[in-house]
Amino acid sequence: MPKIYIDQGHNPSGFNTGAEGNGLREQDVTYAVGRELATLLRRSGNYEVRLSRNTPNEVLGNSNAGSLRERVNDANAWGADYFISIHTWR
């Protein structure tokens, strides 16, 4: 069964928080989209799915580079076949 790692781009606080506009924060949108995508993929029964953030307040890494490195290392350690990184703009 293919393994799909879904990276909900950005952190909720501190550094690497993403874009903001129209009353929305990128990290909140990517978190919600990632959770919904994971639900749909799991429901199909055809994929194993892992999310980069399991709670909306989870912060990964301690710098921009550290955050990205942690996400990639987690996906590779898990043996992901696919890495989907979610981002938004406007």
List where the protein language model places each region.
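Catalytic-core regions of hydrolytic enzymes
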Residues: 2-90
